[in-house]
Structure formats: structure tokens, C-alpha cells
Amino acid sequence: MPSLKEIKERITSIKSTQKITSAMKMLASSKLKKAQYQMNCFLPYQRKLNAMLNSFLFCITDFKSDLTKKREIKRIALVIFSSNTSLCGTFNSNIIKLFNETISKYRYLNQKDIEVYTVGKKIEDYVRKLTFPLKVEGNYTQLIEKPNFARLKQLADKLLSDFLNQKIDKVELLYNHCKNAIFQTTNLEPYLPIQMKQPKSTSHADYIIEPDRDTVLNTLILRSLYSKIYAVLLNSVIAEHTARLVSMQIAIDNADEILEELTIQHNKQRQQTITNDLLDIISSSEALK
């Protein structure tokens, strides 16, 4: 049985750890609220933009764009979103699992024909340590801490340029999506070529487009692509902070349970020590009579 000193040391150690997890929980909560605010401000714009674009393309059936053309897949680019740090539950392991499944899906391609863009230090470290070489393109880990539309636009422009120049034939986005505080999903979404959805309303409107149809539609397509990858980044950041918030709360609850057990154990041990001391005093007193 541990001594009183050992129990006190464990209690002190757990309380110290609990302070750290509480601070991390507060920090995760603050970052989560900030990311949710960014998403809430951005989401109406993205939805309206996509609805407008889909409506135009549904009505203008003869419009053609190189960004919508499907080609035989000979070279692919994967953009994977993870976190920069740990202590966020299964957040990173889930995205790594999805990445491995995706790589297996394209095993018919040569390794040099798979480009990997990592947005997050954890997935970057994992890819660099693989036994088979996959080239990591660019450095975008800073976007996780500070989501920046302009910086992410540079990545989107690189992907667009490579796709239009037929250096790659397909682009896919891999990320975590937070449905609620308990449930998260790993998503794989096609990015290029563009896949347009049919609008809910099937009525054909007679649009007057200025300055000209192609200029407006190409601009809308580009903005839609920029907004999509930015929304994916914000989704991943929200999922990360939610996972960390839940993990820290679980750690705090576990610490409370252990502290309760140790406190009971400490009190019992202390009571036993006092009882033994009293018995020794009584025994000594009886012996002196």
C-alpha cells in the first residue's frame, strides 16, 4: 500500500496536470469560437455563390470550360488537412486512415504521379516518413493556426494551373468534418474537375449577363473553387478544436475521478495511521500502570 507521502505526491501531480488540461480546454474553446465565427460569416456567401453558378450552368447548356472536362486519370493531386499538434483524440488518425485508403485506391498509378499537398504538420510528418516516397508539395502548415484566404488562394491557383496545363488530371480534398461535439466524419471531396449540382428549381430563367457570358461564368467558377477550399479548411479547423475540447474535458473528468479515489485512499490511510498511533499510546499507558 502506498504511503501518505506517495499519495500526496500523486494528488499534487494530478492537480498540476488538471490545470494544464483546463487551460488547453479554454484555449481550444476560444479558437473554436473564432473559427465558427469565420465559418458563419463565410457560409452564406459560399451558398449564394454556388446556387448562382449552378443556376447559370443549368440554364446555359452550351457553356464549356476546361475545368469541367473529365480526363483519364494518369496523375492526381491530393490535398490533405490535419492539425499541427496532438491531443485532439482520433482527429489525425482518422485522416491518416482516409489518406491510406485513398492511396490504395490509386495504387495503379506510379508514386511519382501522386502529388500530395499537406495542410497540417501531423499529416506532413506522416507522409515524409512513409516507406514509399511521395513528394510533399509546398508548405501550408501555417494555415491551420491562422486560416488565410489569400494564402490558400495561392494553393488553389497552383492546382488550377496544373490542371489546365494537364499536369494533373484530378484533385481531391481530404479533411475532417464536425457534425456535432460527439460525431465527426472524414470526407473525400472532388475538387477538379468541377462537378456541378442541378439546382432545386428547374425553371429556365432568361438571364441578361454583362459584360459577357463567358467572362461572368469563368469568374464565378474561380470564386466557387476558392470558396470551396477555404470552407474545407475552416471545417477542418473547427473539427480539430472540437476534438481537442472534447479530449480535454474527458481528461479533466478522468482527473476528477482519480482525485476522488486518491482522496478517499489518503483519508483512510491517515485515519489508520492515527488509529495505530492511539493504540500505541494506549498500549504504552497500560504497560506503565
Swiss-Prot record:
According to its record, how does it sit in the membrane?
Peripheral membrane protein
One of the record's GO molecular function terms = ATP binding
Identify one Gene Ontology CC term for this UniProt entry.
proton-transporting ATP synthase complex
Q: Which domain of life is it from?
A: Bacteria
Question: What's a BP term from Gene Ontology annotated to this protein?
Answer: proton motive force-driven plasma membrane ATP synthesis
What does the UniProt entry say about where the protein is found? Answer: Cell inner membrane
Q: Is Hydrolase among this UniProt entry's keywords?
A: no
SUPFAM superfamilies per the UniProt record, alphabetical: ATP synthase (F1-ATPase), gamma subunit
- What keywords appear on the UniProt entry? ATP synthesis, Cell inner membrane, Cell membrane, CF(1), Hydrogen ion transport, Ion transport, Membrane, Transport
- Chief subcellular location equals membrane
InterPro entries in the record:
ATP_synth_F1_ATPase_gsu, ATP_synth_F1_gsu
Task: Give the record's family classification.
Answer: Belongs to the ATPase gamma chain family.
Q: How does it assemble?
A: F-type ATPases have 2 components, CF(1) - the catalytic core - and CF(0) - the membrane proton channel. CF(1) has five subunits: alpha(3), beta(3), gamma(1), delta(1), epsilon(1). CF(0) has three main subunits: a, b and c.
Question: What the protein does?
Answer: Produces ATP from ADP in the presence of a proton gradient across the membrane. The gamma chain is believed to be important in regulating ATPase activity and the flow of protons through the CF(0) complex.
Q: What is this protein called?
A: ATP synthase gamma chain
Species per Swiss-Prot/TrEMBL record: Azobacteroides pseudotrichonymphae genomovar. CFP2
> Which gene is annotated as encoding this protein in its UniProt record?
atpG
